[in-house]
Regions:
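Active-site rim/adjacent substrate-binding subdomains
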Residues: 1-101, 113, 117-122, 128-130
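Catalytic glutamate of the conserved HExxH
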Residues: 105, 109-113
């Protein structure tokens, strides 16, 4: 058995996102998912990571607290970066499915930027229809 590829992780992310409750996905209209093996050095430094395995995902963009509801000409879309190798390492040591881990990372990366509490995000994850 070989490790899931970048494309397979992206497909899992798309499926995980599609399974989330509509009240959450409406907040995220236009969000773009990117999958890379690892975060780049700039991101690792910015997030103060000790190793390249410390970061499973990252939201880049504007959440509602930052004014995402306001249209900006030429603004980059909101993006969620998923980091394949750290996710796979986490999965190898977890009892959760890979899909559950990806769902968790997506909900938390997006949720924090939209001002959701941990309790809100747990409810969203429980509402996922996988």
């Amino acid at each position: 058995m070989s490790a899931p590829t970048l494309a397979e992780i992206e497909a899992l992310a798309d499926a995980a996102f599609a399974a989330l409750p509509e009240k959450f996905t409406r907040l995220c209209e236009g969000v773009v998912f990117h999958v890379e093996d690892f975060p780049d050095e700039e991101t690792l430094d910015e997030m103060e990571c000790e190793t390249e395995f410390d970061l499973l995902g990252l939201f880049r963009g504007k959440g509602l607290p930052d004014g995402a509801h306001l249209a900006e000409t030429g603004a980059e879309p909101n993006m969620v970066w998923l980091y394949r190798r750290p996710i796979l390492d986490f999965w190898a040591e977890s009892e959760d499915t890979l899909g559950d881990i990806i769902t968790h990372v997506l909900v938390h990366e997006i949720g924090h930027h939209f001002g959701l509490s941990d309790a809100d995000m747990e409810e969203i994850e429980r509402g996922a229809v996988l």
